[in-house]
Regions:
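Membrane-interface transmembrane helices that cradle and orient dolichyl/undecaprenyl
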Residues: 45-46, 85-104, 112, 282-285
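Transmembrane-helix signature of polytopic, membrane-embedded enzymes
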Residues: 39-61
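Specific aromatic-rich, kink-prone transmembrane helix
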Residues: 38, 78-95, 274-277
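Short acidic/glycine- and proline-prone juxtamembrane loop motifs at membrane-interface regions
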Residues: 25-28, 67-78
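Transmembrane-helix motifs of polytopic, lipid-linked glycan transferases
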Residues: 26-46, 84
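Transmembrane-lumen/periplasm boundary regions of multi-pass, lipid-linked membrane glycan transferases
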Residues: 107-108, 115, 120-263, 280, ...
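Membrane-embedded architecture of ER/inner-membrane glycosylation machinery
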Residues: 103, 230-508
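Short hydrophobic/aromatic helix or loop-helix immediately within or flanking a transmembrane segment
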Residues: 1-22, 112
Length: 508
């Protein structure tokens, strides 16, 4: 459901580091580092090195940035490309003319578009740029060269999209394969225009992104009562740097708000631009008592939460152990999590005490670094076997033995990734009924050596109940293991059971 650019990057990193637990995370990590550097360089060129440092640290401390940098998802790579595009465009528009940067920015927008369809968004910055009053032309030489600038937009952008559209077009030209043409139609039309205008999932109200900003953009959103009036004053003065950064951010917000389908990651590309726009104001804001109090309170809240959760785990309180049991976790594996969380709380309290409310910004950076260190070194190694299905699939392998063949029905991608042997599947987006139509005969061919791993609610009533094995739970899904002898020729899944296993468009 996505063009292959992100998968190309993961395959390339696997060639460099042939160990999937590391390789599949590297594109996001490298994209996060690139985004931080680009944010720093844009702010440095538009203001000063001190402002650039504030911009980078502001971006680093926002929760959504850390979460996306640590996930093997496409969105961090997309944001690196949109930020690279803005870097090139703003260098030309505000500090140009710089034709190489301009061409690179347009090319990056094209590559971003074939990475995820909204990669063209940086081009929206051209709208406020064209709307700038003529009085700014004297300080913006590139504005007087708008005709030449526009002439490069389409060729450079199309060149970027040709990274994937070129090979795809050649393949379509030389092939009559209906599956290839359906693949192209799915990506070029259904997953773009149709998905935007007539979203079939994740339907949210118009104001949904205000909720996202108020939560995932902590602690930066706490400063909005001070930032918004300051930004407005600079917009009224017509400072082109603020006009382009803020107007572009508003256009992106409106673009996504207008679509009925909304997810929290959609507005992530705005974040670096807003951090750059906030950076020149942060030195002054951090001298204000109210700002320091809010940021100190945020650090203390994280510290208290860490101590409370960690203490509950370390003391074997009922709510902590009950949560672990519900997720299928072994209680012994939970204990290190408790100590890491207690350590996080101690760091937060120490940072707050050291700052004494006067160095709230520094305490926040220290706490953020501690948070992601604990998350990466303490929490995820303990939780990963259960959240990634590796523990579940290990049990499956042990139960069926090394010589058995394994099939999957109504499966998730992580089940396939964590399986200890080659797996036979019967479709991913196919209905359960269609999958059973193929899985049943497959089991019947070797009923004593073939097993089926299946989502519990996808098992039809005609499967022998006595032979069903409840093998475990993962990510709030219950799974069963069925030997080939549990199926018989007259067992057919009812049409009412035919649901999509991979819900269309889930991979965002």
């Amino acid at each position: 459901e996505k063009p292959p650019v992100f998968m190309w990057l993961q395959a390339a990193t696997y060639e460099l580091v042939p160990h999937w637990p590391v390789a599949f995370l590297l594109p996001s990590l490298l994209a996060a580092l690139a985004t931080l550097w680009l944010t720093w360089d844009i702010a440095r060129r538009l203001w000063t090195r001190r402002v650039a440092a504030h911009a980078v640290l502001a971006l680093f401390t926002v929760l959504q940035f850390g979460l996306m940098a640590k996930r093997a998802q496409i969105d961090m790579v997309l944001v690196a490309l949109t930020t690279l595009s803005l870097w090139g465009l703003l260098r030309h528009l505000l500090r140009g003319p710089d034709w190489r940067a301009w061409t690179l920015g347009l090319f990056a927008a094209g590559v971003g578009t074939v990475t995820k369809g909204v990669g063209f968004l940086p081009l929206l910055v051209l709208l406020p740029w064209m709307a700038l009053r003529r009085t700014h032309w004297r300080v913006l030489p590139a504005r007087a060269l708008a005709g030449r600038s526009w002439a490069l937009v389409l060729p450079a952008f199309v060149a970027g999209t040709a990274v994937w559209l070129g090979p795809l077009g050649i393949a379509l030209w030389h092939s009559d394969d209906p599956q290839l043409h359906a693949y192209a139609h799915e990506l070029l039309f259904k997953q773009t225009g149709t998905r935007y205008a007539h979203a079939w999932h994740h339907v949210k109200p118009f104001w949904y992104y205000l909720q996202v900003i108020a939560t995932l953009w902590l602690p930066g959103c706490l400063l909005l009562p001070w930032l918004l009036p300051a930004w407005w004053r600079r917009l009224r003065r017509g400072d082109p740097r603020y006009v382009l950064l803020l107007a572009w951010s508003v256009l992106v917000l409106l673009f996504f708000s207008a679509s009925p389908g909304k997810r929290e990651v959609y507005i992530f590309p705005m974040l670096p631009a807003l951090c750059i726009a906030a950076a020149p104001l942060l030195a002054g804001l951090l001298r204000q008592r109210g700002v320091r109090a809010l940021l100190t309170g945020y650090v203390l809240l994280l510290a208290v939460a860490g101590l409370a959760l960690g203490g509950g785990i370390a003391l074997h309180l009922h709510w902590a152990e009950n949560t672990a049991v519900k997720r299928g976790m072994e209680l012994a594996s939970l204990q290190p999590v408790g100590f890491w969380l207690i350590g996080l709380g101690v760091v937060g309290l120490a940072a707050s005490a050291w700052s004494r409310g006067k160095r709230a910004g520094t305490a926040l950076v220290v706490m953020t670094a501690a948070l992601w260190t604990v998350f990466g070194l303490g929490l995820m190694p303990a939780l990963d076997p259960y959240s990634s299905s590796s523990c579940l699939m290990q049990r499956v392998g042990q139960r069926i033995g090394p010589d058995a063949q394994l099939g999957m029905l109504a499966w998730r991608e992580q089940n396939l990734l964590q399986a200890d042997r080659p797996v036979t599947d019967f479709g991913f987006k196919a209905s359960w009924q269609d999958q059973w139509a193929k899985a049943g005969p497959w089991l019947a061919q070797a009923p004593h050596t073939r097993w089926l791993f299946v989502l519990k609610q996808a098992v039809p009533a005609c499967i022998d109940p006595a032979q069903r094995i409840d093998i475990g739970e993962s990510n709030r899904n219950q799974w069963q293991l069925l030997p080939g002898t549990a199926w018989h020729a007259g067992c057919i899944a009812a049409a009412s059971d035919a649901e999509q296993t991979g819900g269309e468009g889930d991979a965002d």
